Amino acid sequence: MNFQEKLHSGKFVITAEISPPKGIDTDGMLKEASLVKDIVDAINVTDNQRAVMRMSPLAACSALRQEGYETIMHLTCRDRNRLALQSELLGASSLGINNILVMSGDYPTKGDHAGAKPVYDLDSVQLLGLIQKLNAGYDFSGNRLEGKTGFCAGAVANTEINELMLIKLRKKIKMGAAFIQTQAVFDTGRFCEFMDKIDPI
């Protein structure tokens, strides 16, 4: 049962997160992945997490898939305009990478290339809408594609409960988010409160 099938089955899903290497040697990443093999349903692969430059998540996911792992490729709006986002997604689909987690991305000043210019051509809600269009066989401008994608797109949410978070979450679900992931949770009471609050959504 793959990740998408397990989501639809209602069974409990377990994922782990791995950062691509800061370089071209994937041995360390693959060794990390081996520690959770047969334990997790998919491995999240970050996209320049905390604005620190690393190998493309597309290449990292491809390397992991060659070793038999199912992946969830992170894709941020920070570094790419709508052309580059679509190219990256089409490339991912052609390589069998069909699980995508979209997010805005940390601002570059937080990372190791403080002078980098952010893009943010689209926000995460618009990126989810873009993925819906690719799945329907069209690009963002409505032009027909040669073959359509089959992405299972997810989004992120902050467990800090406020009205703005709830509005954003509703928009993400409306735009096709099939799953929601949060940062690591250490306060179970707060997380239970978060789950109760979003349950009606």
PLM feature spans:
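Active-site-adjacent beta->alpha loops and helix N-cap segments on the catalytic face
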Residues: 1-6, 25-27, 51-63, 81-89, ...
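N-terminal amphipathic alpha-helix/helix-capping segment at the start of soluble metabolic enzymes
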Residues: 1-19, 23, 31, 139-151
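Hydrophobic faces of well-ordered beta-strands that scaffold small-molecule active sites
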Residues: 14-18, 41-45, 71-75, 100-102, ...
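Conserved, mostly hydrophobic/aromatic
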Residues: 17, 43, 92, 172, ...
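Active-site cofactor/substrate anionic-group-binding motifs, chiefly glycine-
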Residues: 39-79
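Hydrophobic or amphipathic alpha-helical targeting/insertion segments
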Residues: 90-102
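Active-site/ligand-binding-proximal alpha/beta "capping" segment
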Residues: 130-179
